[in-house]
């Protein structure tokens, strides 16, 4: 399914990007907000609150992308990670090149996050990092509760890896 998710992402990237920038315009004073923290820490809740407080800001969220894949059902979330990550890259490339302000709701579990911050700084974005911390037991319990309510499964190994790597990469 990973190859299918990548193929789907590549063939539909324009539609996904259009949804990200819908209603927004490039900004004279560009803002880049990077979210970090483990699954279940509350990143999306903080990002959503920021989006509501700020005007003219694009939200880039792999979870939103993943939910729009035709075969996605929540329990198979890891099968769509590659495609969703590719859409994050496409969207980030686009907003950086065109000068849109944005919130990037991801973890810093991969080293590419540092590169993305550097890219924003080089393009004169006012750049902020929000690190949302939650006790790992509480975050894991929230992740399991979210799986029941939303159907989105996060494998325990991925949770542990994201928790450790997001802290190390920040």
What are these regions (language model features)?
Residues 1-25:
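N-terminal pre-Walker A segment at the start of P-loop NTPase domains
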Residues 23-30, 95-96:
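Phosphate-binding P-loop
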Residues 38-39:
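The conserved Walker
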Residues 43:
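Conserved lysine of the Walker
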Residues 46:
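Hydrophobic positions on the alpha1 helix immediately C-terminal to the Walker A/P-loop
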Residues 50-100:
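Conserved substrate/cofactor phosphate-moiety recognition/catalytic segment
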Residues 83-131:
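Glycine-rich phosphate-binding loop used to anchor ATP phosphates in small-molecule kinases
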């Amino acid at each position: 399914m990973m190859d299918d998710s990548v193929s789907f992402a590549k063939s539909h990237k324009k539609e996904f990007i259009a949804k990200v920038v819908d209603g927004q315009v490039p900004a004279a004073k560009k803002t880049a907000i990077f979210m970090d923290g483990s699954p279940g820490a509350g990143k999306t809740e903080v990002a959503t609150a920021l989006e509501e407080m700020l005007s003219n800001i694009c939200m880039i969220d792999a979870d939103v992308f993943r939910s729009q894949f035709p075969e996605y059902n929540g329990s198979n979330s890891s099968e769509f990670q590659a495609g969703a990550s590719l859409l994050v890259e496409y969207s980030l490339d686009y907003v950086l090149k065109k000068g849109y302000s944005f919130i990037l709701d991801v973890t810093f579990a991969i080293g590419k996050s540092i590169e993305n911050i550097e890219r924003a700084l080089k393009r004169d974005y006012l750049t902020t990092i929000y690190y949302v911390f939650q006790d790992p037991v509480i975050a894991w319990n929230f992740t399991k509760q979210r799986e029941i309510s939303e159907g989105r499964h996060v494998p325990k190994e991925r949770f542990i890896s994201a928790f450790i790597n997001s802290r190390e990469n920040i």
